Amino acid sequence: MPQIVDAVKLPVVAAGGIADARGMVAAFALGASGVQMGTVFLSCEESGASPNHRKALLTREAGTTALTRGFTGRLARGIKNQLLDELNKKETEILPYPLQRALVRHLSIPAEKAERRDLLPLWAGQSARLSRCEDVSVLLSNLVAQVSEIAGSVQRWSAIRSSQPQPETR
């Protein structure tokens, strides 16, 4: 990311794998002007994700994700389950977007009603295990407070470090 920040005059927004304040601070330290967080918001009731999808994000299985074109015909990441595995076995038979999306959506309706999470397209990023069930306003408030806390720790460390004698360089 530092190379991109140095090479462009536009704001750089970090995305992918950022699900908590530590990831946000790391992105800012590397020069990002902002961050885009996705999966961490899916477990919030306000997300519009189905109850089964939100529950799946809070399980151990959420830590095992894989890439697939099977959900929509376009590359996406999801929680590994029977549906994802079966679709990936038939990768050469996957329809182009939006046909594949329509097909999977049609199959998802009865799976959702039957609470068959193993047959649902469970979109999730690599940091899905960091998801927690919170109201979105609580999640945002916590993120702001935690970023401030981490930033304060970094500033204190920097002040301590700069007050120590530095070795001579030749």
Model-inferred region functions:
Residues M1-V13, I18-R170:
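Conserved active-site-proximal phosphate/metal-binding subdomains
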